């Protein structure tokens, strides 16, 4: 559960971490924020590139609900969620799910998504491996109340499917960031317009990198 005391501790830890890396935080704006990266699911892909920076075009144009990191900023990641969504790249009302909901992911697509949950995230920054293997399974969350014809999933988006990151990960907008989700094989089937969303929450430090 999020608390004011916990949020203050996260803020102070992030400030100390950024300062220890040689960046000035005395005149920088430090605020709570988030990053959101999306990539379309595919039956032919087992290695998904997770875009973080605003100028990352490896997967093509950015999707409408993404929130990327500006090159001038640093983001300290303190929580991560990996969820599944359904919607086109331009759908502003695309819904997110914390597990392969059988009401939405019909036929075999719900079972086939286990190849994603049996995979892992890995992160390399400036050719240095920062996160070798972060299991996606820790984000799998099935609520007590599940969706049916007359109900919707119970889901607290402030906590469910989010997992704390310690020590905090420094996402530097001026760095070469290679973020990947490695699935345990490509899904045999996928629902049309379904995608993976990686949401990072933490502290944003504005205008502190070498990029002006």
Can you annotate each of these PLM segments?
Residues 1-212:
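Beta-strand-centric surfaces of beta-sandwich/beta-rich domains
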